[in-house]
């Protein structure tokens, strides 16, 4: 076999056994662990095939029909399909599907609408916001004057009176609504009324809830917002990436220019092809059933945790996620994440509102149901999962050490493997 033949023929296992081995181990982890990280999901075989396709070879700077390279006629088809499907999915007139990530989609909107030093408002990180919503360690907090709003201390719900008061005091150029750890319904209409009163743009980051919006389980930010951004993974169940949506043609032109050439060069055409596939899947009737089940499962999980003696921030959830306050179990988020991980339950430590602990320790964990729902889990399974979580945390409380309770974790791990074996994923692999 010539070198050229080998280049096009040798499989990964032969070319790079180290990477192949890591992928095989990751497949085993995903098959046997319960994934409760709210920002993660499991894509279809079709999405995997599109993302792993030969479209990865193609440079395509520009937009469909207006490229800086030749040979783009077929990647144009993929991007045009992604755009049209995104528009249909969210009922909007314009979509940019090129952002490589959630951070880049938000940066593109800032680049289009703000100048360095301008004021914008965003949800405080400790109340469930995102780094790109004005955190001082992020570009958004370094380049702009950020006015943060938060939740009320009593019920941990958004303090809309505070939003209105701060908006009137500071006259921001943009108000950003949306978050990564807020479990209740957003009042887009009230946000728009406040934005109009002070002459601000309303931007909605619906990265976490876009799948629920598409599936009819959360109110759409349109027609209230000027622009919405969303990642394409999470509850949308697509490849990792971002997009920008609007009904305003003038703003759409600004966003297109901000993405390219403002922030990015050549778009990732294999990822855009996979986005198109995922949007097509989300347009099918069964996706509405999926979104409804995600919410049902989250409610079942939250109720079970509360019955087990845990506090759920704001008292429950209306969407796919919940923040669990661990202080009643004398646990930190760091300890709980590690203990649950040893029991094959994957989650992430997360700050809770007014958290006394440091960001890398935290008093809480964030749990979500999209990935488990994709596997086929329903309320009964999530009630079982809730009981297993309580079992691990009770064992951790008794042990009162970073090492956890080995016997309890081993027993739960065995139950988890039994549960996940009933819901296989990627059987062809």
Curated annotation (Swiss-Prot):
PROSITE patterns: SHMT. The keyword Transferase applies. Pathway: One-carbon metabolism; tetrahydrofolate interconversion; Amino-acid biosynthesis; glycine biosynthesis; glycine from L-serine: step 1/1. Keywords: Amino-acid biosynthesis, Cytoplasm, One-carbon metabolism, Pyridoxal phosphate, Transferase. This is Serine hydroxymethyltransferase 1. It catalyses: (6R)-5,10-methylene-5,6,7,8-tetrahydrofolate + glycine + H2O = (6S)-5,6,7,8-tetrahydrofolate + L-serine. The keyword Iron-sulfur does not apply. (6S)-5,6,7,8-tetrahydrofolate binds at residues 125, 129-131. SUPFAM superfamilies: PLP-dependent transferases. HAMAP family: SHMT. GO terms for molecular function: glycine hydroxymethyltransferase activity; pyridoxal phosphate binding. Homodimer. InterPro entries: PyrdxlP-dep_Trfase (IPR015424), PyrdxlP-dep_Trfase_major (IPR015421), PyrdxlP-dep_Trfase_small (IPR015422), Ser_HO-MeTrfase (IPR001085), Ser_HO-MeTrfase-like (IPR049943), Ser_HO-MeTrfase_PLP_BS (IPR019798), SHMT-like_dom (IPR039429). Catalyzes the reversible interconversion of serine and glycine with tetrahydrofolate (THF) serving as the one-carbon carrier. This reaction serves as the major source of one-carbon groups required for the biosynthesis of purines, thymidylate, methionine, and other important biomolecules. Also exhibits THF-independent aldolase activity toward beta-hydroxyamino acids, producing glycine and aldehydes, via a retro-aldol mechanism. Its EC number is 2.1.2.1.
């Amino acid at each position: 076999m010539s070198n050229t033949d080998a280049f096009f023929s040798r499989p990964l296992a032969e070319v790079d056994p180290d990477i192949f081995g890591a992928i095989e181990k990751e497949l085993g982890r995903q098959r046997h662990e319960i994934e409760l990280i709210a920002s993660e999901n499991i894509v279809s075989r079709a999405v995997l095939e599109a993302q792993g396709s030969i479209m990865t070879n193609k440079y395509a700077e520009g937009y469909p029909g207006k490229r800086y390279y030749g040979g783009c006629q077929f990647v144009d088809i993929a991007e045009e399909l992604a755009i049209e499907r995104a528009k249909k999915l969210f009922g909007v007139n314009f979509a940019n599907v090129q952002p490589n990530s959630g951070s880049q989609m938000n940066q593109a909107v800032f680049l289009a609408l703000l100048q360095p030093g301008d004021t914008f408002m965003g949800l405080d990180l400790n109340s469930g916001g995102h780094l790109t919503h004005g955190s001082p360690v992020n570009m958004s907090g370094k380049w702009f004057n950020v006015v943060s709003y938060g939740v009320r201390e009593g019920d941990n719900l958004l303090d809309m009176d505070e939003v209105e008061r701060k908006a009137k005091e500071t006259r921001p150029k943009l108000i950003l609504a949306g978050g990564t750890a807020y479990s209740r319904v957003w009042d887009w209409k009230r946000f728009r009324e406040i934005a109009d009163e002070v002459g601000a743009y309303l931007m909605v980051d619906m990265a976490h809830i876009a799948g629920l919006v598409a599936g009819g389980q959360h109110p759409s930010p349109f027609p209230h917002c000027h622009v919405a951004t969303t990642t394409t993974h999470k509850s949308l169940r697509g490849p990792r990436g971002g997009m920008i949506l609007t009904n305003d043609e003038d703003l759409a032109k600004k966003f297109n220019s901000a993405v390219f050439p403002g922030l990015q060069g050549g778009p990732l055409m294999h990822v855009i092809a996979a986005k198109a596939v995922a949007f097509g899947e989300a347009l099918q009737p069964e996706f509405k059933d999926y979104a409804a089940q995600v919410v049902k499962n989250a409610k079942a999980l939250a109720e079970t945790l509360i019955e087990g003696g845990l506090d759920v921030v704001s008292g429950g959830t209306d969407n796919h996620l919940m923040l669990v306050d661990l202080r009643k179990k004398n646990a930190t988020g760091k300890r709980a994440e590690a203990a649950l991980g040893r029991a094959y339950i994957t989650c992430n430590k997360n700050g809770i509102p007014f958290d006394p602990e440091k960001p890398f320790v935290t008093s809480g964990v964030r749990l979500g149901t999209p990935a488990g729902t994709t596997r086929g889990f329903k309320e009964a399974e999530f009630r079982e999962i809730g009981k297993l979580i309580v079992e691990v945390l009770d064992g951790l409380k008794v042990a009162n050490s970073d090492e956890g309770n080995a016997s309890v974790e081993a027993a739960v791990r065995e139950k988890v493997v039994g549960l996940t074996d009933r819901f296989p994923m990627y059987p062809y692999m």
